[in-house]
Amino acid sequence: MVSPATRKSLPKVKAMDFITSTAILPLLFGCLGVFGLFRLLQWVRGKAYLRNAVVVITGATSGLGKECAKVFYAAGAKLVLCGRNGGALEELIRELTASHATKVQTHKPYLVTFDLTDSGAIVAAAAEILQCFGYVDILVNNAGISYRGTIMDTTVDVDKRVMETNYFGPVALTKALLPSMIKRRQGHIVAISSIQGKMSIPFRSAYAASKHATQAFFDCLRAEMEQYEIEVTVISPGYIHTNLSVNAITADGSRYGVMDTTTAQGRSPVEVAQDVLAAVGKKKKDVILADLLPSLAVYLRTLAPGLFFSLMASRARKERKSKNS
């Protein structure tokens, strides 16, 4: 039985429910609308930011660098494509100018050929890059080399070679182009690092070391360049389905020549390039572009280091057993 007091309170309860629901729903939809508008404005600003921007991309002849060239070109950027193979760069330019139907005005790219491990060539290359359009808006440090091997079997020369390509080369090119950006108080430095710049896995020591150094340098650069209004973005992809593992060097410097299973199952470089474009357009500072497990491993390394180290030791044992079987 419902008491008289309860009966009297029922209309009040229903009235309160009605008021609450009618107040919350508009508020909820309003918040969603504001969020959607914010994302739309971000997208529009990103498109405008990239259109007609002078973008330098290293390692543009293959893999992620080549796909980045395609998406930045389609976005209307003025490209300066860099690499060691001039013929491959020319072929890429022909491909870009012949096949891309875009809604924005595009510009014929320039090419600059040089080796990132040659410090003298980098200085000359930077001068040549600046001659193309007179300035640089965005530098995408993408070129790199991977490595497979045990620490004890790896010569120091191999360690140096990986560091020269992945760390010292990009640092030297960045330093060579920074003065022109500082003078204009405008510019954006992008470092394509790796998830292994945030945590390390066995038999990748030289590569992981070079990417940890990359992360540290560009984090410092971001803080120091804030006064000049220069943006710095570090992008850390996980496995990408490219020839990175095939072209990796081994402990003695020879070519690895194997497509690792993890690499073969990695993300499409086309998708990753689109994510890079979006991150640059939104001026993000630090981005992880990896699947769930590698991303979780980054946090596990910090929150539960003992467990992380045990898992890496187990991985090392399994890889050794697999190679010896």
UniProtKB/Swiss-Prot annotation:
Membrane-spanning parts: 18-38
Membrane protein topology class: Single-pass type II membrane protein
Chain residues that bind NAD(+): 62, 64, 207, 211, 242
Class of enzymatic activity (EC top level): oxidoreductase
Residue intervals on the Lumenal side: 39-325
Record topological domains on the Cytoplasmic side: 1-17
Catalytic residue list: 207 (proton acceptor)
A UniProt-annotated Pfam family: adh_short
Amino-acid positions noted as binding substrate in the UniProt annotation, renumbered to this chain: 194
Location of this chain's protein in the cell: Endoplasmic reticulum membrane
Family statement drawn from the similarity comment of this UniProt entry: Belongs to the short-chain dehydrogenases/reductases (SDR) family.
Function in brief: Putative oxidoreductase.
NCBIfam families per record: PRK06181.1
Protein name in the entry: Dehydrogenase/reductase SDR family member 7B
Gene coding for it: DHRS7B
